[in-house]
């Protein structure tokens, strides 16, 4: 399956001009007999170097080809359509201003708190476990939550596991986090998690992180491995811990406005292509992880990969976080992702 995904990506690289058009967008459907294509807006939170783009480009190219050009899709990276406001882009999707949308579950949880469930600390310990859960009951639960939030889930991919870097110490135990000033996502669960581990979590724009680390205003930060490398964070830190503490899925969705305008045949096509697109995206994400992990040797960086026993100590330390959010997430939903109280 991986070889197939890589082959698809190579083909996509050769098909750069797939989303040209720049029509009005946002007005899906239209007269089936019209020769003028309907241009749909697809918003992502990432630049075109990300694995998310591989999925977006696959979807755009396939839909245009299989509808004989009735639909063209323009991809907008870095949340251009919402002025960089990631939560705002979800709201624009709900309003039907954005037609198609890729965003991680972490940000979706600002709209529907239950969508934070798969991102909880040390919940799914391996990609094998992730695939079993996300291709099964966990993934179906997420799709239903998106549908209840004013959108239609077309597929689920991944940003991957989040790691941690800092300039103070090698992190091998919960005690090593004490007092560290760390940039974390501005999501309540993440802030509370790092406070519970004794750190000093702060929220700031990602664009400020590099300089803050360089100048000592921050001790460290966390992110997926590919972003820590591609955003050059590894240039200004001394220590990295690979601990796979939080898995972050990517949700690919359509607005209800677009969905209601499609024929039954088009809905089937969009669903099937969306699922395929996120398979391509996920394979690209895992290849990017392997490539970035190999690249760590190029940096003046001490890399610590935690053992199962070391991770067990962290799992024990974060149990209060699960208790804190038991009512918000629900015991049944936590169970879908492998956690029982």
For the regions a language model picked out, list residue spans one by one:
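Positively charged n-region of N-terminal signal peptides that target proteins for export
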Residues: 1-5, 9-10
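A gly/proline- and charged-residue-enriched helix-loop-helix capping module
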Residues: 125-145
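N-terminal secretory/targeting leader peptides
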Residues: 22-127, 147-341
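C-terminal motif of bacterial Sec signal peptides marking the signal peptidase cleavage site
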Residues: 16-20
